[in-house]
């Protein structure tokens, strides 16, 4: 298949399987000309109002459980010999929820009262768990480690260690591990066949080089406590470079557990630019440690709703909703992406938001061309592909014949509709999958990610278009300077994705590691979207090659799936390799042929098409690619996609202008050639594109 010089697909190089002439017209003249309504797994349109009685929200529904048994720990000023408590009130601490509205005295009192209580609990626990000799040895070991650190003596290898003996009872062992780390946060404990061993916490020493000892000890107490919904805040710091170093350390060492963010200090001003770093547990990290296996979903709050949006990308809509609801984009789940230049209806589920909270923002989001309805509580999130398909209502305007075609226009239109109904269309991924009209297309970003070229992928994402507007000026500035902070000041507030990425780059730097961190500012569904875009481009090219090489005939080595109702994620066990005998007997038809969408768990055709796949991967430098990007936690198993699909429930109306009134009137199939628009309605399976179906019908680019 031919490609543009910038690597994007020339959509007009794709094939047709029908021999009609087609016609010309304009689609998406306005969003109301292109309506997309998701069809759920039960075959119902999601735009249809649900029976409210079926989704009555329980008034006694509980919030997510916070029943973690460990006490809240705000200990900040525990010296290793447990002597000096002076100045503890001046140290920042961790707390449940948001305490930003407390006065300084309230904060100090709450911190100190809990500190005293927790110190007593830890000391009492250790004395009750250890015999006197072991307890004394532990105290001496802790003092020795502290003296070595204070004298700047480097620890020898292997690290010094102390055995606290074998503890046969599992629960008793767990309590001992926690009690030691709470009393001595500069120590760590490890288990070895029931034996509890104590070692120096080298990461605590590293953190002490960046922050005060009190802050470092407090942070490790916070980390061990794993108190749900808690936060830990370091002292305000006016030095931006120093704060960045602390961010880097915490995210490098504990990024899988916690996330960090700087907030202006209480006395922040232009002359006093101090900000404080606040740490909180990541949602997944809290979930793994706070709930028994498989119990989190039952206790979390999930709210399902239908999202109506107009002239907005799905990701853009999610970003706006996340801001209004105070959650992050990855808290939203959906069955599929929908067109931007359209009015679309789709199911969504948001986590950690009650139905009442979602209802409260309805008026605000209407200003952003969005609406939410069918709001109800559910028990789990949505998965990609969890839909039956989509229903389309489309108006094609300015109808006319193809160039040099003088035939009756109405007959051309009716012929085209009947052909596609009966013979189908090539099931290409649509141009919107790749960023139609954009200089850099999504598949190019996906290729860079598959090759682990993280900095390149970021720069591709931030490549400007040839348009003189604030967004593209900001992107130009970034590519010229790599100044993430300066670019943030230029990037408009409504560009949620770009700003999230730039905030991460400002925090972590424009390095390979920093760019990996920046990609995590996007939810998993968006990160993997770019990989899927590359796989989609290869599939489109493979489909064109297959049709050019063999035409409509099913040949030996083709892959077929006889179940036309199977979704695109059916396993390889459902795929059959066509034999020579089956080719000769014409056992199968073209609509049963599937091609693999790239991944680590797919089978390739055993004919010229299979060889083409390998050559395409080698061309792009992916001959050894395993379709896993561990740095971004992306795994792409692959799937299969039918070459040909058919629209269902097709209906149409021709609309003509009335010569007397200039108003449009609807006519039957025998109208004359003054038709000005065509109203089409049809259903497509999940992951099929209406623009591709129209392309086959009209025989031209859309």
Swiss-Prot record:
Record carries keyword Transcription regulation: no
One GO term (biological process): mRNA processing
Active site: 339
PROSITE patterns for this protein: TRUD (PS50984)
Residue ranges of the TM segments: none
Coiled-coil regions listed: none
CDD domains: PseudoU_synth_ScPUS7 (cd02576)
Region (Disordered): 84-116
Domain TRUD, chain residue ranges per copy: 424-646
Keyword annotations from UniProtKB, A to Z: Isomerase, mRNA processing, Phosphoprotein
SUPFAM superfamilies linked to this entry: Pseudouridine synthase
Top-level taxon of the source organism: Eukaryota
Molecular function as annotated in GO: pseudouridine synthase activity; RNA binding
Residue numbers of Phosphoserine PTMs: 79
Keyword Phosphoprotein listed: yes
Reaction catalyzed: a uridine in mRNA = a pseudouridine in mRNA
Family annotation (InterPro entries): PsdUridine_synth_cat_dom_sf, PsdUridine_synth_TruD, PsdUridine_synth_TruD_insert, PUS7L_N, R3H_PUS7L, TruD_catalytic
Top-level EC class: isomerase
EC number from the UniProt entry: 5.4.99.-
Compositionally biased spans, kind Basic and acidic residues: 96-109
Functional note: Pseudouridine synthase that catalyzes pseudouridylation of mRNAs.
Family: Belongs to the pseudouridine synthase TruD family.
Name used for this protein in its record: Pseudouridylate synthase PUS7L
Natural source organism: Mus musculus (Mouse)
Gene name as annotated: Pus7l
């Amino acid at each position: 298949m031919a490609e543009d010089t910038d690597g994007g697909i020339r959509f007009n190089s794709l094939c047709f399987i029908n021999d009609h002439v087609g016609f010309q017209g304009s689609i998406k003249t306005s969003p109301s000309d292109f309506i997309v309504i998701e069809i759920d797994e039960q075959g119902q349109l999601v735009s249809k109002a649900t029976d409210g009685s079926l989704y009555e929200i329980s008034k006694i529904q509980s919030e997510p459980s916070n029943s973690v048994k460990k006490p809240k720990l705000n200990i900040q000023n525990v010296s290793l010999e447990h002597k000096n408590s002076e100045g503890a009130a001046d140290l920042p601490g961790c707390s449940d929820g948001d305490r930003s509205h407390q006065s300084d005295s309230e904060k100090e009192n709450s911190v100190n009262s809990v500190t005293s209580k927790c110190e007593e609990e830890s000391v009492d626990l250790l004395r009750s768990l250890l015999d006197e000799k072991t307890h004394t040895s532990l105290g001496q070991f802790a003092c020795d480690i502290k003296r070595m650190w204070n004298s700047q003596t480097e620890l020898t290898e292997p690290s010094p260690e102390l055995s606290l003996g074998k503890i046969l009872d599992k629960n008793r062992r767990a309590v001992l591990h926690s009690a030691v780390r709470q009393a001595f946060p500069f120590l760590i404990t490890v288990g070895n066949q029931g034996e509890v061993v104590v070692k120096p916490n080298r990461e605590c020493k590293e953190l002490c080089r960046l922050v005060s000892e009190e802050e470092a000890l407090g942070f490790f107490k916070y980390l061990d406590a794993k108190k749900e919904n808690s936060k830990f805040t370091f002292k305000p710091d006016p030095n931006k470079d120093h704060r960045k170093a602390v961010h880097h350390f915490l995210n490098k060492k504990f990024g899988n557990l916690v996330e960090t963010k700087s907030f202006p200090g209480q006395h922040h001003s232009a002359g006093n630019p101090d900000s404080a770093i606040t740490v909180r547990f990541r949602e997944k990290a809290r979930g793994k440690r706070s709930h028994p296996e498989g119990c989190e979903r039952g206790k979390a709050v999930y709210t399902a709703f239908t999202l109506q949006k107009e002239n907005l990308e799905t990701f853009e809509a999610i970003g706006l909703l996340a801001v209004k609801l105070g959650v992050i984009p990855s808290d939203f789940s959906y069955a599929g992406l929908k067109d931007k230049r359209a009015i679309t209806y789709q199911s969504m589920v948001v986590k950690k938001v009650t139905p009442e909270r979602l209802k409260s923002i309805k008026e605000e989001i209407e200003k952003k061309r969005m609406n939410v309805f069918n709001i109800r509580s559910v028990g789990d999130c949505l998965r990609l592909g969890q839909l039956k398909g989509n229903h389309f209502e489309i108006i094609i305007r300015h109808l006319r014949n193809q160039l040099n075609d003088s035939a009756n226009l109405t007959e051309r239109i009716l012929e085209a509709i009947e052909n596609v109904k009966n013979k189908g269309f090539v099931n290409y991924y649509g141009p919107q999958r790749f960023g139609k009209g954009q200089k850099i297309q999504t598949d190019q970003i996906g290729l860079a990610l598959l090759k682990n070229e993280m900095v390149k992928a970021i720069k591709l994402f931030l490549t400007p278009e040839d348009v003189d507007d604030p967004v593209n000026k900001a992107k130009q500035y970034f590519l010229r300077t790599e100044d993430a902070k300066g670019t943030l000041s230029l990037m408009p507030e409504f560009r949620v994705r770009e700003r999230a990425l730039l905030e991460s780059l400002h925090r972590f730097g424009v390095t390979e590691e920093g760019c990996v961190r920046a990609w995590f500012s996007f939810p998993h569904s968006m990160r993997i979207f770019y990989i899927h875009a590359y796989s989609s481009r290869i599939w489109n090219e493979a489909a064109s090659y297959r049709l050019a090489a063999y035409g409509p005939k099913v040949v030996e080595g083709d892959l077929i799936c006889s179940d036309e109702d199977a979704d695109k994620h059916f396993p390889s066990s459902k795929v059959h390799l066509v034999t020579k005998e089956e080719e000769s007997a014409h056992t199968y038809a073209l609509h049963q042929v599937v091609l693999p969408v790239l991944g680590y768990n797919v089978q390739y055709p055993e004919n010229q098409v299979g060889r083409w796949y390998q050559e395409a991967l080698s061309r792009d430098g992916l001959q050894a690619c395993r379709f896993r990007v561990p740095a971004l936690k992306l795994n792409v198993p692959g799937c299969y996609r039918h070459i040909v699909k058919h629209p269902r429930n097709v209906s149409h109306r021709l609309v003509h202008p009335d010569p007397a009134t200039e108003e449009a009137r609807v006519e039957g199939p025998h109208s004359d050639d003054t038709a000005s628009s065509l109203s089409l309605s049809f259903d497509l399976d999940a992951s099929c594109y209406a623009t591709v179906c129209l392309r086959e019908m009209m025989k031209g680019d859309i």
